[in-house]
Amino acid sequence: MDVLKKGFSFAKEGVVAAAEKTKQGVQDAAEKTKQGVQDAAEKTKEGVMYVGTKTKEGVVQSVNTVTEKTKEQANVVGGAVVAGVNTVASKTVEGVENVAAASGVVKLDEHGREIPAEQVAEGKQTTQEPLVEATEATEETGK
């Protein structure tokens, strides 16, 4: 019977040793799996961050392009508006001058320049000013 007990004792020790080795193997595999999952998660995070950064750069570049195009168009429209306003203002001034001259409110000399009211009252209807070609410089300075 001792032999039988001894045999069971060896078997028991073998099973315990096998169970311990299996447990250690499972723990090692679980640790490696956990590390693998962590590595995969880190790589995924890096990939997502890279894609996010590239997307952000693309959006910023697109916004900057749209901003520049909008500024260019605003400048074009602004220039056209200024030119239009200047044309309207010039035509308005011409119209007022024509109405004033036609109604007799203002007297003009032979060159189309206004004769001051004092000279009209005194009978002097000529001016002593030399003729000056109208240019932007003369219009700005008034000379």
Curated annotation (Swiss-Prot):
Q: Which GO terms describe its cellular component?
A: axon terminus; cytoplasm; neuronal cell body; nucleus
Entry's localization field:
Nucleus
Q: Region (5 X 11 AA tandem repeats of [EGST]-K-T-K-[EQ]-[GQ]-[VA]-X(4)): which ranges?
A: 20-78
Q: Which Pfam families match?
A: Synuclein
* Molecular-function GO term, any one: cuprous ion binding
Record keywords, A-Z: Nucleus, Repeat
Does the UniProt entry include the keyword Repeat? yes
State the superkingdom: Eukaryota
Q: In which tissues is it expressed?
A: Nervous system tissue. Found in the electric lobe, the brain and the spinal cord.
Listed InterPro entries: Synuclein (IPR001058), Synuclein_gamma (IPR002462)
Positions of sequence repeats: 20-30, 31-41, 42-52, 53-67, 68-78
Q: What is any one GO biological process for this UniProt entry?
A: chemical synaptic transmission
Has keyword Acetylation? no
* Other comments on record: Three isoforms are detected: 17.5 kDa, 18.5 kDa and 20.0 kDa. In the neuronal cell soma, the 17.5 kDa species is predominant.
**Briefly, what is this protein's role?**
May have a role in synaptic regulation or signal transduction.
Regarding protein family, the annotation reads: Belongs to the synuclein family.
Q: What is this protein called?
A: Synuclein
Which organism does this sequence originate in? Answer: Tetronarce californica (Pacific electric ray)
